[in-house]
């Protein structure tokens, strides 16, 4: 049976028309789904009983099921969500100064095989549907409402389980639904999609104007990247940078490059200088992330002095480089950790 939250607005409109109703009825149903977070068609009280009855014959509303919630001392909240087929994914609410950011998954598992990430250890299971991706936003907002939290869910980052651009069609439908003014009404400035670099849809995404882009880079050379991110090696760094140089940006906009610091792997002064050289070809800023030491993975975090020295080299060359503080380490908040823990398959670091 059709899950209404899987539908774009135009698909919902077509469904409503096929049931013999005028198209404007779709706006009413859409608002119930996204603004009022209605979970039963019968609860749409300003929709006619006849339409509700016909809708219930062909459709339903299915959110992901919250299987586990973990709350960190720093305010981070991690959800383990069960999908219709029993697969499980994760999403995270991250507290900021005046709002929350949700970190969303796009696939069950991942084919990229990054050596520092627990999701890669799971392998690729399947793509998530638009409703499954959007359902994470509904779950997050409902949690904050139920807790009476005053800070709202304002920003979305597609940096959870999976490679978003390998689920491009469903990602695009999700972004369109997020933008709809009579629904969740997120602006493109509030949405970031992170990719390891998939050539096929990279520029297509930029042309939509529906989000900002972040690149999961993590290494300044092709050889280093192949060692820690074997799946990303399909697109050579030089070719990736050539594509990114064509990526459509607003006048003051820059591409964000995520760089996970691994002791003795990619944190040397020479790595920092090579990173500056690599990024000189594009309008860039760097988000440095310190690896969280994790049993079962062959990596460790650099010490604070090494991290600051790396950052100082980038900044001295005129490159904006921020240091992202890890949150939720006490609740396995990095990508794939909670599912892997529950599956008994180990833990890892997110992108």
Swiss-Prot record:
Binds 1 [4Fe-4S] cluster. The cluster is coordinated with 3 cysteines and an exchangeable S-adenosyl-L-methionine. Its main location: cytoplasm. Disulfide bonds join 103-335. It is an enzyme of class 2 (transferase). The keyword Transmembrane does not apply. The active site is at residues 90, 335. It catalyses: adenosine(2503) in 23S rRNA + 2 reduced [2Fe-2S]-[ferredoxin] + 2 S-adenosyl-L-methionine = 2-methyladenosine(2503) in 23S rRNA + 5'-deoxyadenosine + L-methionine + 2 oxidized [2Fe-2S]-[ferredoxin] + S-adenosyl-L-homocysteine; adenosine(37) in tRNA + 2 reduced [2Fe-2S]-[ferredoxin] + 2 S-adenosyl-L-methionine = 2-methyladenosine(37) in tRNA + 5'-deoxyadenosine + L-methionine + 2 oxidized [2Fe-2S]-[ferredoxin] + S-adenosyl-L-homocysteine. GO terms for cellular component: cytoplasm. Pfam families: Radical_SAM, RlmN_N. Its EC number is 2.1.1.192. Specifically methylates position 2 of adenine 2503 in 23S rRNA and position 2 of adenine 37 in tRNAs. m2A2503 modification seems to play a crucial role in the proofreading step occurring at the peptidyl transferase center and thus would serve to optimize ribosomal fidelity. Belongs to the radical SAM superfamily. RlmN family. This is Dual-specificity RNA methyltransferase RlmN. It comes from Solidesulfovibrio magneticus (strain ATCC 700980 / DSM 13731 / RS-1) (Desulfovibrio magneticus). The lineage of its organism: Bacteria, Pseudomonadati, Thermodesulfobacteriota, Desulfovibrionia, Desulfovibrionales.
């Amino acid at each position: 049976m059709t899950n209404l939250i899987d539908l774009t607005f135009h698909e919902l409109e077509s469904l409503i028309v096929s049931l013999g109703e005028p198209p404007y009825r779709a706006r009413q149903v859409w608002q119930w789904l996204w603004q009022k977070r209605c979970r039963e068609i019968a609860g749409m009280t300003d929709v006619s009983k006849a339409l509700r009855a016909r809708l219930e014959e062909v459709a339903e509303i299915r959110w992901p099921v919250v299987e586990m919630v973990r709350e960190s001392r720093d305010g981070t909240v991690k959800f383990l969500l069960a999908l219709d087929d029993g697969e499980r994914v994760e999403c995270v609410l991250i507290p900021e100064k005046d709002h929350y950011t949700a970190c969303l998954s796009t696939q069950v598992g991942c084919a990229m095989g990054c050596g520092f990430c627990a999701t890669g250890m799971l392998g690729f299971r399947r793509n998530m549907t638009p409703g499954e991706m959007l359902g994470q936003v509904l779950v997050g907002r409902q949690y904050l409402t139920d807790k009476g939290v005053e800070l709202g869910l304002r920003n979305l980052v597609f940096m959870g389980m999976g490679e978003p651009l390998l689920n491009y069609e469903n990602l695009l439908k999700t972004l369109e639904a997020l933008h709809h003014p009579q629904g969740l009404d997120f602006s493109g400035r509030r949405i970031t999609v992170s990719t390891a670099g998939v050539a096929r849809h990279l520029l297509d995404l930029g042309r939509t104007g529906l989000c900002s882009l972040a690149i999961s880079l993590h290494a300044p050379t092709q050889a280093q990247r192949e060692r820690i991110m074997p799946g990303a090696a399909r697109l050579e760094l030089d070719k990736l940078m050539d594509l990114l140089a064509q990526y459509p940006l607003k006048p003051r906009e820059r591409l964000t490059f995520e760089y996970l610091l691994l002791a003795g792997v990619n944190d040397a002064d020479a790595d920092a200088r090579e990173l500056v050289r690599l990024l000189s070809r594009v309008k860039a800023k760097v988000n440095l992330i310190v690896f969280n030491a994790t049993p079962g993975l062959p990596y460790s975090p650099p010490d604070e002095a090494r991290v600051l020295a790396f950052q100082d080299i980038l900044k001295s060359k005129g490159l904006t480089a921020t240091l992202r503080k890890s949150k939720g380490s006490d609740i396995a908040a990095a990508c794939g950790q909670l599912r892997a823990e529950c599956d008994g398959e180990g833990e890892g670091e997110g992108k």
